[in-house]
């Protein structure tokens, strides 16, 4: 069973993502902001991460930078899941190390398909 870190400060979206992933067979680690996610990763390694961009204390871009700079997590697939749909935001996400980018609102089948692609491509 793969473990996915979900970091989102929006209760509704966070709970929706948790429900989708849990019922699809994933173990889910949950954080309400980037700082909490980073602290959670220290003792609970995840196979993949689904990160919001706009979060208090540490946003998704900064969290991605931390993940990519840490040798333990450098290869962990990261999917940005955010309301920020501008091309500039997407490009910035990819430049900072995101492997994929999906905007809210989203289709649950598309979220799962993209995670499976990351799982196959990066995790084998």
Language-model features: locations:
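Charged docking surfaces used in two-component/phosphorelay signaling
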Residues: 15-23
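Short hydrophobic/Thr-rich beta-strand motif most characteristic of the beta2 strand and flanking loop
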Residues: 25-32, 40
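Active-site beta3 strand of CheY-like receiver
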Residues: 45-50
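Receiver (REC) domain active-site loop signature in two-component systems and cognate sites
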Residues: 55
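C-terminal output helix
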Residues: 106-116
